[in-house]
Amino acid sequence: MLDYQLVQLCKDNRKESKATTANRRAMFRLFAKQLEENGYNIRKMTPHDLKGRHVNKLLEQWRKDGISTATIKNRMSALRWWAKEINNEGAVKSNVELNIERRVFVTNESKAISLENIDLSKIDENIAQSLRLQDSFGLRREESMKFQPEFALDGQWIDNAKYIVLKPTWTKGKRGRTIPISNENQRKELRKAYALAQKNGGSMIPKEKSYKSHKSNFESVTHALGVGQTHGLRHGYAQTRYLELMGFDCPAVGGFRSLTSEEIAKDKEIRMLISEELGHSRINITSVYLGSWSKK
């Protein structure tokens, strides 16, 4: 039966906490029950039978039941894990495509983390360099691990390169993008990354490791360093870019002023630019990174 096989799928994955696994098992039992209630023969289904129509039916049921957006998003994450485990990630569309509303929480408190007081010399050099790339270019964790300097430079020399290119297969939602090179520290980190990639076979992942095994090690190391999932490095990049482009600090790091009409227009333009550099496509998400002048 589908519910039993889904529970077994969870048991086969031993890289996550017991709490996460238990929560996922409970959700999978619910999914199987709801699919059966909606006419699917779960006795003949296996986890590999997951299709878009099953996802759509579950989503339809949750909306009918008045389930909160937060809970729906958690359930969608479980469905994406299922799809990934059976190598059928296309079965579950993005939240945007499924019209699951976005929530943006603005606190005007900085969530940035800095590498300045962290000793990276004692950890794996590949992980250390990925962290520096995240810090310098605002990369996501996966992007920093899969980063291939030769591809990213797009035929440019490091000394006079104007931008880097991120391959769609490295990125969230397969949205490739370019990020400008605006300071010498970025060039310094590109040189280090380039030299390391030569040893690794192209990326920041050791050639003897798969992405999955390297990611597991990466998570253990960053947890021990106290930087969590490293998302705070992207916050730091966004805040530094805002200062660089606007000439004064953003609200999240204590910026306080009454913007002129010209500054309001420039603020909007720069927030959209930073949003694109971070791999987003909407301006309101930047309030999470930069804060909001309206909350001052």
What are these regions (language model features)?
Residues 182-246:
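Active-site/catalytic core of tyrosine-dependent DNA strand-transfer enzymes
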Residues 45, 176, 209-216, 262, ...:
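Catalytic phosphate/metal-binding cores of nucleic-acid and nucleotide-processing enzymes, i.e., regions
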Residues 100-120, 173-185:
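DNA breakage-rejoining catalytic core of tyrosine-based enzymes
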Residues 79, 142-148:
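Alpha-helix N-cap/helix-start motif at helix boundaries, enriched for small hydrophobics
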Residues 146-190:
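Conserved tyrosine-mediated DNA breakage-rejoining catalytic core shared by Y-recombinases
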Residues 236-280, 295:
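C-terminal catalytic core of tyrosine-transesterase DNA break-rejoin enzymes
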Residues 114-142, 265-271:
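Basic, Lys/Arg- and aromatic-enriched nucleic-acid-binding interface segment
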Residues 7-103:
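N-terminal core-binding DNA-recognition domain of tyrosine recombinases/integrases
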